[in-house]
């Protein structure tokens, strides 16, 4: 493979990348050919890893196409072109351009004799899985040293080599899950506001809520909505730089950048995106350096009119170990809770998933599953997959009897966890009263209201009849239980404290 082939790829892709991205990641690379192998040198490990993770797929795709199906060998190394014969001497103008690019200075020109650098598709925030590529590491000549090259006469050029054999053209991989869209998101009372806010951001970028902060328990659809926004943004503008990542990835990238003295490249990347989508922001808690860096990144993005979407398992003010200035800024936009789905939504989710799987799910069967799996959408979908698999293996239609067989362990656990006894104990602990108070004839508000809450929870979470529930609450009749349920439903609409208490207890009992 010749350097000319590399240059052809560069010319095809040069216009696809913003100048800042090209200067930061691509221009610092040096290239030389040795036989059928093309050696590409990065100035440090951070740049090498970034090129390998973000750009390799597109780069190999172009090399394969321009090579007319040939299987070229490509080596990524740390260091610079070696000066010993028979290799060509390093190109000084290109090295200078690389140094300027890494320092953030603009590069107006590069010597015409300097090998051009390749550029792939837009960056994403996680390693690109490379399929059909055989990768192996060779021993490095030396460990990475930021001071390498300070004295070229004292030490030979250093390189850590990774050889990549191409077996056909590769497709660029996106880390937005393409299956998560607004079209297949099941909307209900529990997520209606969150869905509406996410759509506003996706359909009117830079004019919606910024930041958009979604919070709630696991498996409730926060990540689905986040991916749906990203996918819609890219649908409207395929050239948009939309980055989705988990907060731990942000921390890992920052640590790597600090270790390799490449924090400026890290900052330039994360502050140049059009939309930054970070999942599970609570993992920043008690990570002071990460919070410091994210604080400045967050400010830079909002000042530049770029969209930020965050998720957490709790309300931002409740995240312990998170700096107050971050909590305050998260409140600049819109904060929306995603609640556990109500019965009707759970049934709708099951019916939609069954339809997507081309499976006939009777409505009474969906209702049976939805009544018993209440905690989150993820567990609901998992239960449905088990039922479908059982139906397929047994060669039987889906019925309530088959559901009982396939989910017997899960249903037994649910019945054990969500018993009236457990509800009484949990409610008593929550309100700091005794179980005997719930069963007593006392009518003081401090006891009567928790008793009504416990009765309402018992009706919603168990299969007991109203008379059975009344019997275990001190021998009360079914009309008392019915009145308690109606009263709590009314208070949930008008009393924020009762609504929050009920939600917390429901989450505790079903998670």
Curated annotation (Swiss-Prot):
Pfam family, one: Bac_DnaA
Spans annotated as Domain III, AAA+ region: 175-391
Region (Domain I, interacts with DnaA modulators): 1-87
Primary localisation category: cytoplasm
Compositional bias segments (type: Basic and acidic residues): 134-144
Residues covered by region (Domain II): 87-174
SMART domains, per database record: AAA (SM00382), Bac_DnaA_C (SM00760)
Region (Disordered): 133-160
InterPro entries per record: AAA+_ATPase (IPR003593), Chromosome_initiator_DnaA (IPR001957), Chromosome_initiator_DnaA-like (IPR020591), Chromosome_initiator_DnaA_CS (IPR018312), DnaA_C (IPR013159), DnaA_dom (IPR013317), DnaA_N_dom (IPR024633), DnaA_N_sf (IPR038454)
Domain of life where this protein originates: Bacteria
BP GO annotations: DNA replication initiation; regulation of DNA replication
Keywords assigned by UniProt, alphabetized: ATP-binding, Cytoplasm, DNA replication, DNA-binding, Lipid-binding, Nucleotide-binding
Binding-site residues, ATP: 219, 221-223
Cellular component terms (Gene Ontology): cytoplasm; plasma membrane
Location in the cell: Cytoplasm
Cysteine disulfide partners in this protein: none
Region (Domain IV, binds dsDNA): 392-511
Functional description taken from the UniProt entry: Plays an essential role in the initiation and regulation of chromosomal replication. ATP-DnaA binds to the origin of replication (oriC) to initiate formation of the DNA replication initiation complex once per cell cycle. Binds the DnaA box (a 9 base pair repeat at the origin) and separates the double-stranded (ds)DNA. Forms a right-handed helical filament on oriC DNA; dsDNA binds to the exterior of the filament while single-stranded (ss)DNA is stabiized in the filament's interior.
Domain notes for this protein: Domain I is involved in oligomerization and binding regulators, domain II is flexibile and of varying length in different bacteria, domain III forms the AAA+ region, while domain IV binds dsDNA.
Protein family according to the UniProt entry: Belongs to the DnaA family.
Assembly description: Oligomerizes as a right-handed, spiral filament on DNA at oriC.
Name used for this protein in its record: Chromosomal replication initiator protein DnaA
Naturally occurring in which organism (per UniProt): Pseudomonas syringae pv. tomato (strain ATCC BAA-871 / DC3000)
């Amino acid at each position: 493979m010749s350097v000319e082939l590399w240059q052809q790829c560069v010319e095809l892709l040069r216009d696809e990348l913003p100048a800042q991205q090209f200067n930061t990641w691509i221009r610092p690379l040096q290239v030389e050919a040795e036989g059928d192998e093309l050696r590409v040198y990065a100035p440090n490990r951070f740049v090498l890893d970034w090129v390998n993770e973000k750009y390799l797929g597109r780069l190999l795709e172009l090399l394969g196409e321009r090579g007319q199906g040939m299987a070229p060998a490509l080596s990524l190394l740390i260091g610079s072109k070696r000066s010993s014969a028979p290799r060509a001497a390093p190109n000084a103008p290109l090295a200078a351009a690389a140094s300027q690019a890494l320092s953030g200075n603009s590069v107006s020109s590069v010597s015409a004799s300097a090998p051009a650098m390749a550029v792939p598709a837009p960056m994403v925030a996680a390693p690109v899985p490379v399929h059909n590529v055989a990768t192996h590491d060779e021993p490095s000549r030396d460990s990475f040293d930021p001071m390498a090259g300070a004295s070229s006469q004292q030490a030979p050029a250093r390189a850590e080599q990774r050889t990549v054999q191409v077996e056909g053209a590769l497709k660029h991989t996106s880390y937005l899950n393409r299956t998560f869209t607004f079209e297949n998101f099941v909307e209900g009372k529990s997520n209606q506001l969150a869905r509406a806010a996410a759509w506003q951001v996706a359909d009117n970028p830079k004019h919606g809520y910024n930041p958009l902060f979604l919070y709630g328990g696991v498996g409730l659809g926060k990540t689905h909505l986040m991916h749906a926004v990203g996918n819609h943004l890219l649908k409207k503008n395929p050239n948009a730089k939309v980055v989705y990542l988990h907060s731990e990835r942000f921390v890992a990238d920052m640590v790597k950048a600090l270790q390799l003295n490449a924090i400026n490249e890290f900052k330039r990347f994360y502050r140049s995106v059009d939309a930054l989508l970070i999942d599970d922001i609570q993992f920043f808690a008690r990570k002071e350096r990460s919070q410091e860096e994210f604080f400045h990144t967050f400010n830079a993005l909002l000042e530049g009119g770029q969209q930020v979407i965050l998720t957490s398992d709790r309300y931002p003010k409740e995240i312990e170990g998170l700096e107050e200035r971050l909590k305050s800024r998260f409140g600049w936009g819109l904060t929306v809770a995603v609640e556990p789905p109500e019965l009707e939504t759970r049934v709708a989710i099951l019916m939609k998933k069954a339809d997507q799987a081309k499976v006939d799910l009777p409505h009474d069967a969906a209702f049976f599953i939805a009544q018993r799996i209440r905690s989150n959408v993820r567990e609901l979908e998992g239960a449905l997959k088990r039922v479908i698999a059982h139906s397929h293996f047994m060669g039987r239609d889906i019925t309530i009897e088959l559901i009982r067989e396939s989910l017997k362990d899960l249903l037994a656990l649910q019945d054990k966890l969500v018993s009236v006894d457990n509800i009484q104990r949990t409610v008593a602990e929550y309100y700091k009263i005794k179980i005997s108070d719930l069963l007593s004839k006392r009518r003081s508000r401090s006891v009567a209201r928790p008793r009504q809450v416990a009765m309402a929870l018992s009706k919603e979470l168990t299969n007991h009849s109203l008379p059975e529930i009344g019997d275990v609450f001190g021998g009360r009749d079914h009309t008392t239980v019915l009145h308690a349920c109606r009263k709590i439903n009314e208070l949930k609409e008008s009393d924020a404290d009762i609504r929050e208490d009920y939600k917390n207890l429901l989450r505790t009992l079903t998670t």
